[in-house]
Each structure stands twice: as C-alpha cells, then as structure tokens.
C-alpha cells in the first residue's frame, strides 16, 4: 500500500500566494481601464511569468496619467497635441504648453542611436535606441521637477503665488517600430520601455525585416494575425510587469503595396492576382531568375518586371468576379442582380476568404475564372497588396481588441480619409481612441488647405475621435531651422546676430534658458552643497561672481543699432 503524501505547509503557502495574486490580476483586469481589452491568455498565465519580488515602475504612474489625459480629450472631443522631442531642452520647453511627449524612432535613427551611427528610418538600429532616448528625457523630466520643487520651497508664499507651476512630468509615448523581431524581441523591447519611463508605446504592422518610414515606398505588411501576436506580446509583458502602459497599434495598410503572407483570411480581399490566362505557369519570380541567369541586371531586370506587370491585369479577386459577371451572356438585369448579390456577400466587413469567395462565385455562375495570386509574387516571395483606407479599417477592428489606440498612417492630410477611417473603425468598436500623425512629410502648403483650415485641422479631426495627434519630427525640424538661420546670420553679423536672434528673444518670450546656469540646476546642487556643509559653502556655483547676476538687473544700452547718436534703450529685467 502506497504511503500517503503530506503536503508541506510551505507548498500550501506558495499556492495560496499564487492564487491570491491571480485574484488580484483578475480584479485589475475587470476595472474600467481594461473594459475594452480582450486577452487570449489568463491571469494564471501572467502570474506564472512573474517573479516573487514585486516591483513598481514610475512609468506606470505616467501611464495612468496618460490614460486619464486621453480619455478626457476623447470625452470632450479634443486632442492631446504634441511632437517628437529631441533632447532635455525641448522636453522642458514643451512641458509648459503640451500635455504629452512623443519620442520618434525616425529622430533617434538620424540623431541618437545606441551605436552613434546615424541613418534613415529603417529600424536597423539597436533595439535599445529608442528606450535609451526615453530614459534620457524621462530623467530630465524628473530632474527639472525636483529642481522646480526646491526652487519653489525656497520662495515665500507670495512669491510662489506669482510664479507659475510647470508640470514637467508629461507622459511619454514612444516609437516601438515593428517590435524588432519575433515575440521574445517584442517582449524584451516592451520591458525596456517600461523600465526606461515610457507611458505608452506604438507598434506597427510592417514586416520587421523590410520596415520603412511610413512615408517611404516599398512597405511590406505582415498578416493581421502576426501583428495581433505582436500586440498580445506587448500587452502580456505589460501585464507581467503590472503596468497600465498605453498600447497604440499603427497600420500602414493605406499605402502598402506588398504583404508577407496570405495566411490570414482577413487579408485575402486586398491581395492582387493575375487575370491574364496567357501568363499561366509563367511567374514573375521565375522570369526574373531566368533574366539574371543570362546576365541581366538593374534596368534590364526592371524592364522585364514592368512589362510582365503591365500584361498581368492585376486585380483583387472581388474585382475579377465582377468583371467576369459583366462578361456573361445574360440580360443586363440578370447581370446587375448577380453583381449586386456578389457585392452584398463580398462586402469588406465580411472578410471572405478566397476559398469562400470562389464557392460564392461558382454559385453565381463564375466557374472558370482565372485568378492567381502566386504568379505576381516578388523575388522575395511577397504578395501584391492593394492598400486602402478600407484595408486599414479591417485591421483597425482586429487590433482594437488588444490595443488602446489605433493609428492609420496616411500619405497626406486628407480629411475624407480621416473621416472614412474613423467612421469605419467606430462602426464596430465605437469606444476605441484614435491617433493621427500630423506628419512633416506632408507638404502642407500643397494640401489645398487655407491657413484657417490648417489651424482648424487638429480640432476638426479631434471631433472624429483622434484624441492623440502629433508631429513626429517637429523637434528635428525646429532644431534645424533655428541653427541653420542663426549660423548663417552669425557668420555675417557676429555677436549682434546672437543677441538679436537668441538672447533678446529669450528675454522677451520669457524662455528660462536665458539664465542657463539656473536652468541646468546650479542652484539645486548648491542646495546639496550647503546642506552637506551645514548651510554654507564657499564653493557654491551660484555665489558671488556668477555672471548670471547680469540678467537680474535693469540696465540701459547705449548706441542701440538703428538709433540716433547719444540715445539709449532701457532693457527690461529678465524673467528668471
């Protein structure tokens, strides 16, 4: 007879703690924050992936703040507007006027990679590049928050009442590109973002091996299901870490021309096939391989591809069926009836698979249709894809089950596209929040909008549900504009260029970098020195002799440029 097994109390305690934590996670998930989120895993899965040492993350407090900010804008029909910040100077200036901060992968790729090797936005930099920039800015936010608190607590109540308080702790949303590889790469990337201070992360549905800036050509999508896996990986990692990090799903389906796979039926209606029967058995890839074998390259291969594509008569399966129905030897009324029946069943929201489409077409009399989506595949094996707002809507429906915001990348600031996408996505997921890239890649002056319409663009699409809007590269362009124009003028006019363009403008606009020693925190660290040394320090940085005292005075400036001899100009005291 087998001996009975007595479960040690330690094992029971371990299980008890595990079950209690599972219950905590289930309660957390049932909160208002996650009422729209659907997870394909359980709370037990999450807790099993956690360690015993419970950790808290400052980014989680920022994530909660971001969520409150965005939901408030959504409720009010307004938008959080922001742009890509390059450095601590920009992030502290932005804090006075904007309620969120963006960290752009493009800007990091061109100005601040982990290897210091700049380049275009191809997501080929080390995957800690953007998290490192997030940490750079998040540390700066926290530092300037501490510095401000020390300064304010050194003031009298009357002085504090007259001194505006700046909330430097604005939530950061960061560019996660495509997740940088497979599931484990996405998991580790998201872990870095949480640890480095990101309140939100966006991940796009391009192929990670061919990723391009959203406004470059040659974009290749992954299947809907593959991008859902990326989003699930991100959400799972946030859950394991116990954070409410805001997840933004971006789709490049509007302008994409290729897709990696036809495995997901939701993509089938947008994949293009050959309808020219004379190309049966003559795939483009084999034709190009033959051309290379005989020594063709470059322009010659491009000519072969162009000629083949021009004769292929590429179209979606649905368009091919409609064309076949219209060619049938039937009365016009019967043709119209069958076309309408096809279009009714093949509506984009039904997401018919190709197999289902062929069955339906056969019932309508289209039994010998030649349509082949394998023949036009590229040399890399990609399928041809007909990008559109409709394709983006279909993806938006799928991604909204996991993500908190949906972002459709566009080629121009098209109000009709914005409306179509918003109405399409919200027809099935009415409470989802939307994001919009107010891209500097758009030639806004060529958009056909008046200045008034440009000014109204943000609030107008905010009313459609785009509650987070951002100029990805405004920090980069602002930096370039200021430095280029100043350098040009400085080369010509010397110090007068600096005084007129920089110093006086800082003074008149109340920009706190005018007193750059104070901005950098010299007073703050003097407080450390004095605290350590009993309240006094002979080596304080802001003591007697610091040149920044000049900016606290009111003075007269004789011989001002453009004024008569003997005149002077009174310059107002700087705003410190």
From Swiss-Prot:
- GO cellular component assignments: glyoxysome
Q: Which GO terms describe its molecular function?
A: isocitrate lyase activity; metal ion binding
Q: Which InterPro entries match?
A: ICL/PEPM, Isocitrate_lyase, Isocitrate_lyase_ph_CS, Pyrv/PenolPyrv_kinase-like_dom, Pyrv_kinase-like_dom_sf
Say if the entry is tagged with keyword Magnesium: yes
Entry's Gene Ontology BP terms: glyoxylate cycle; tricarboxylic acid cycle
Q: Where in the cell is it found?
A: Glyoxysome
Which residues does the record give as Mg(2+) binding sites?
Answer: 175
- Domain of life assignment: Eukaryota
- Its principal location? other
Q: Which residues form the active site?
A: 213 (proton acceptor)
Q: Note one Pfam family from the annotation.
A: ICL
- Binding of substrate occurs at 104-106, 214-215, 250, 437-441, 472
Identify the keywords attached in UniProt to this record, alphabetized.
Answer: Glyoxylate bypass, Glyoxysome, Lyase, Magnesium, Metal-binding, Peroxisome, Tricarboxylic acid cycle
Q: Which cofactor does it need?
A: Mg(2+)
Reactions it catalyzes: D-threo-isocitrate = glyoxylate + succinate
* Residue ranges annotated as motif Microbody targeting signal: 574-576
Under which pathway is this protein filed?
Answer: Carbohydrate metabolism; glyoxylate cycle; (S)-malate from isocitrate: step 1/2
Q: Which NCBIfam families match?
A: isocit_lyase
What is this protein's name? Isocitrate lyase
> From what organism does this protein derive?
Brassica napus
């Amino acid at each position: 007879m087998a001996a009975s097994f007595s479960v040690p109390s330690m094992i029971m305690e371990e299980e008890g703690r595990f079950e209690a934590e599972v219950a905590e996670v289930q309660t957390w998930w049932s909160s208002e924050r996650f009422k729209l989120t659907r997870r394909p895993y359980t709370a037990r899965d999450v807790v099993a992936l956690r360690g015993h040492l419970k950790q808290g993350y400052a980014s989680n407090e920022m994530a909660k703040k971001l969520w409150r900010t965005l939901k408030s804008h959504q409720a009010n029909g307004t938008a959080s507007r922001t742009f890509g910040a390059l450095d601590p100077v920009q992030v502290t200036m932005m804090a006075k006027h904007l309620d969120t901060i963006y960290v752009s992968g493009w800007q990091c790729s061109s100005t601040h990679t982990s290897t210091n090797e700049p380049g275009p936005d191809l997501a080929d930099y080390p995957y800690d590049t953007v998290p490192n920039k997030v940490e750079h800015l998040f540390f700066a936010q926290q530092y300037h928050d501490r510095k401000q608190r020390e300064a304010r607590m050194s003031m009298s109540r009357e002085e504090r009442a007259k001194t505006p308080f700046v909330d430097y702790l604005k939530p950061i949303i960061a560019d996660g590109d495509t997740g940088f590889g497979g599931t484990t790469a996405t998991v580790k990337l998201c872990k870095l973002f949480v640890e480095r201070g990101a309140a939100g992360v966006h991940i796009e549905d391009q192929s990670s091996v061919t990723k391009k800036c959203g406004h470059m050509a040659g974009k290749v999508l992954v299947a809907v299901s593959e991008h859902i896996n990326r989003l699930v990986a991100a959400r799972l990692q946030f859950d394991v870490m116990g954070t409410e990090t805001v997840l933004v799903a971006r789709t490049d389906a509007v302008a994409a021309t290729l897709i990696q796979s036809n495995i997901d039926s939701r993509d089938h209606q947008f994949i293009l096939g050959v309808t020219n029967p004379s190309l049966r058995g003559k795939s483009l890839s084999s034709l190009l391989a033959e051309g290379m074998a005989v020594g063709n390259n470059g322009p010659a291969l491009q000519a072969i591809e162009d000629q083949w594509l021009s004769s292929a008569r590429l179209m979606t399966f649905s368009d091919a069926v409609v064309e076949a129905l219209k060619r049938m030897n039937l009365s016009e009324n019967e043709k119209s009836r069958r076309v309408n029946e096809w279009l009714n069943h093949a509506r984009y929201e039904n997401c018919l698979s190709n197999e289902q489409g062929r069955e339906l077409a056969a019932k309508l009399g289209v039994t010998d249709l030649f349509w082949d989506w394998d023949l036009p595949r590229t040399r890399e094996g990609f399928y041809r894809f007909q990008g559109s707002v409709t394709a983006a809507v279909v993806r938006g429906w799928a991604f909204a089950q996991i993500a908190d915001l949906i972002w459709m990348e566009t080629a121009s600031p098209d109000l009709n596209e914005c409306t179509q996408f918003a109405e399409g996505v919200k027809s099935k997921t009415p409470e989802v929040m939307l994001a919009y890239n107010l891209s500097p890649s758009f030639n806004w002056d060529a958009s056909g909008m008046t200045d008034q319409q440009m000014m109204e663009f943000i609030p107008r699409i905010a009313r459609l549900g785009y509650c987070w809007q951002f100029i990805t590269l405004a920090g980069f362009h602002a930096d370039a504009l200021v430095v280029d124009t100043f350098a040009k003028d400085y080369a010509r006019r010397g110090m007068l260029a600096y005084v007129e363009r920089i110093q006086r403008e800082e003074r008149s606009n109340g920009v706190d970098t005018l007193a750059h020693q104070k901005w950098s925190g010299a007073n703050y660290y003097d407080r450390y020195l004095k605290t350590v040394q009993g309240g006094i320090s002979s080596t304080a940085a802001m003591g007697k002799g610091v040149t920044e005292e000049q900016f606290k005075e009111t003075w007269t400036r004789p011989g001002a440029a453009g004024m008569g001899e003997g005149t002077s100009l009174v310059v107002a005291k700087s705003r410190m």
